[in-house]
Amino acid sequence: KSTLLFALSGIDGVDGGKIVFDGKDLSEFGETELSDIRRTKMGLIFQQPTMLKSLNILDNIILPSIRGNRKNIAKVSEKARTLLKRVGIAELETRDTTQVSGGQLQRAGICRALMSSPKIIFGDEPTGALNSKSAHEIMDIFSEINADGTAIMLVTHDAKVAARTERILFMLDGKIVSELKLPKLNGSDIERRVEEVTAKMLEVGI
């Protein structure tokens, strides 16, 4: 599943077929161009956000945006602070990455992914290392981001996470074996959705 996500984002190449993003075949671009596309139009969030321990939370968030161009550092920092406030960790901007919880670090990772106002966010098990409360809060943030018009694609093994989405592809041994479409989430029906996703997972042998 992670391999598919890396292919869709252009990190890994593919042996056949085409991956079309924003109307363009990614295989037609070189690594420099693909890197620019990921930096400006895609956001990537992983199970364990990669942060530099030598920098504080704010500096880690703005680093990709100012690499090679520090002229707009004030504007970039202002945007980062707005995002930190949005995800509820504005007070942590000067903290070292070792001084925050896993959930707080993941929120910082989301801020970093949003700095370029991406068209799509890819999440590779973004809640996998979090407790249930933090995972629920992270999914709430994803729901808000999606409502603002950003597409989100997640890789997860958690039925509770999958049940918060509207389209689920079930993969087994590298192949899509089933699909489930759900209506827009209504908070009151989450338990039924989890049951439906779990039943489908059992049906296909996941």
Sequence positions of predicted segments:
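Conserved ABC ATPase signature
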Residues: 96-100, 104-106
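A short, proline-enriched helix->beta-strand linker immediately N-terminal to the Walker B motif
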Residues: 115-119
